[in-house]
Every structure is written in C-alpha cells, then in structure tokens.
C-alpha cells in the first residue's frame, strides 16, 4: 500500500502484519507491505507516477504481479471438476463462475480437457449451459447497438460434410433487406467453419466492433469472427483442438453472439438438443428464435427431410414440432 500525500502513517501502533517498505528522506513512512498476503494499493497521482521513476515504479509492480500469477498454482477449477466427475450438476451461478475461471487463464490445459470431457459424459443441463453462456457473453468484446439484427448459425459437428449453409443464408437474408450479424469461427470439430469459407473468398474477417457495426449498417450483413471478439477463448482453444471431440463449446458459440442479437435461427447437431437449447435462449433474454434440426442429420433446416423445430417468443418456448420441405 502506498501512502497518499495528505495522510501520515505512524510507526507506533503499526499492525504486526505490516512491514515498512519505503520511507522518504525525512524518515516518514511512504509504503507498507502485508507480510502474508499479496495486497497492493496503487495511486495514479502526478506527484508520483509522472516523476522520473514513476514509470519504473508501475513496471516493478506489474512485473511482480505477473510473476505472482504465473507461479501460483491453478486450483480454482478443481472443486467444480470433482463435482462434475461425480455426476453432480452445477448451478447456473457455479457454471458462470467456471466460465470465468476458464476465460481468465486460471486452469491448466489438463484440467480444462478433463472438465469438458466429464461435462459431456454427464450431460449438460439447461442451467449449466445458461450459466456458461452468460459468463462467456460477459467476457466478449461487444458490438453495441445491433441487438435488432438476426444471427443465422449452427453448432457444427453434425458430421454431414455439408457446405456452410448458414453463412450462405446470411447473404440471402441481407439481400432480402434483413440485417444479419453473423457470428462464426474456424472449424474445430466439423469440416468447414464460417470463417474458413469467408477467408477463402477474400473477406476480411478480423473486424473491430466499430467496423463490424459499420458493415451491418451499410450492407446489412457483418461477420463477427469469434477469435476476434472472444479473445479469452485463447485459454480454451488449444485444448478443444487437442481433444477433437464435441464439447459444450459447440453449443456455446451460437449462444454468445457479441452483438447480443435478440433474433436467431440456430441449428443443432442432435434432436435431443432442440428443446433444451430453446429454453436456454429464453433464459438469455432472446426475443424470438427458431432452434432447428434436420432429421437427415443436419444442423440446418433440411430441404430433403422433415425438420424438428422449437420456437422461442420471449419467455414462451413451444414444444418441438416438424416442418417439411
């Protein structure tokens, strides 16, 4: 803790838990340190920060904190991992805290892989998916003022080897006068992701939030590259690639559009996900959504077989029904 210039710390009566770490030329106490806990106070004041050594003072503190973080054991995920391994469900609040741990680099790759695998084996609940999605949304780089747009997206992982239908559909909708904030990523467990398609076509995919909003306003469609807007995913991405199986993140991607679109058509890779994901969308505050599964094993609306659909209207979620080509 650093002393504010108008306050005086007396050595007499100083708690035993504190030690003096700095004095001025007259011997007055200027800084103290807790003997047990890494507690710090930083004063951004021109009388200290803008002095000749002010920058070095801040650098020393940041270097120390970085070393402290790098060398500290990463144990925050362990209790949640144990709970899931035992087959116990997480609450929505616990799931959100897990996402905060994952997105903050507080877990080892082995812990992340174990957690994602155990969660899939147990089966993700509606509350768990809602909490994880809420936590991931809070970590995203937001695109403001675009909630009235629509997203057309699929989970991938349907193993159909189809072309990227949702990306193509985004341009059709925009051409018809709609506004599409298309959220997508590179392929992880499927053959081809939205980012792969657009990049191959020469599209600049790494837009800033302002650029993305400008595209949406001018041409009615914008691509929100997950790696640009969910930068904290760098802590999880390598593990997902290594294990190479579907995980809850296949579901979370479509639920975490950085524009927080209130309208969405979302394709899922399995029929048993249609109703639960619709309930999650309602929990997240979406105004209107269609959750779809093509019964010929597509995470899309099929043109060759019936499609299973759940409709979300605010807090109202329909029972699954079929539409046919």
Task: Please name every model-derived segment.
Residues 1-75:
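Amide-donor transfer/coupling interface in amidating biosynthetic enzymes
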Residues 138-141, 162, 177, 199-206, ...:
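Glycine-rich anion-binding loops and their surrounding alpha/beta cores
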Residues 146-153, 181-187, 249-252:
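Core alpha/beta catalytic barrel or barrel-like domain that forms the active/cofactor pocket
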Residues 154-159, 184-190, 229, 295-296:
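Acidic, glycine-rich active-site loops and adjacent beta-strand->loop/helix elements
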């Amino acid at each position: 803790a650093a002393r504010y210039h108008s306050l005086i710390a007396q050595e007499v009566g100083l708690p035993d838990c504190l030690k003096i770490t700095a004095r001025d030329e007259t011997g007055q106490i200027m800084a103290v340190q807790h003997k047990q806990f890494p507690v710090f106070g930083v004063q951004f004041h021109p009388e200290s920060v803008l002095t000749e050594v002010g920058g070095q003072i801040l650098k020393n503190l940041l270097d120390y904190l970085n070393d402290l973080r790098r060398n500290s054991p990463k144990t925050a995920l362990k209790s949640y991992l144990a709970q899931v391994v035992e087959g116990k469900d997480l609450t929505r609040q616990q799931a959100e805290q897990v996402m905060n741990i994952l997105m903050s680099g507080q877990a080892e790759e082995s812990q992340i892989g174990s957690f994602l695998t155990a969660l899939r084996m147990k089966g993700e609940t509606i509350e768990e998916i809602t909490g994880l999605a809420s936590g991931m949304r809070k970590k995203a780089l937001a695109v403001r003022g675009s909630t009235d747009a629509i997203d057309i997206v699929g989970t991938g992982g349907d193993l159909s080897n189809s072309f990227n239908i949702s990306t193509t559909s985004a341009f059709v909708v925009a051409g018809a006068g709609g506004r599409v904030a298309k959220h997508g990523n590179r392929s992880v467990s499927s053959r081809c992701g939205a980012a792969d398609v657009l990049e191959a076509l020469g599209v600049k995919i790494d837009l800033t939030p302002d650029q993305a909003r400008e595209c949406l306003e001018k041409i009615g469609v914008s691509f929100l590259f997950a790696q640009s807007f969910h930068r904290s995913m760098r802590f999880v991405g390598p593990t997902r690639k290594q294990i190479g199986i579907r995980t809850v993140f296949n579901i979370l991607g479509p639920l975490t559009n950085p524009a927080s679109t209130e309208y969405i058509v979302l394709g899922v890779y399995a029929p048993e996900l249609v109703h639960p994901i619709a309930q999650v969308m309602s929990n997240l505050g979406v105004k209107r959504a269609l959750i779809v599964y093509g019964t010929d094993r597509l995470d899309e609306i099929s043109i060759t077989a019936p499609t299973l659909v759940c409709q979300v209207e605010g807090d109202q979620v329909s029972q699954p029904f079929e539409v046919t080509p």
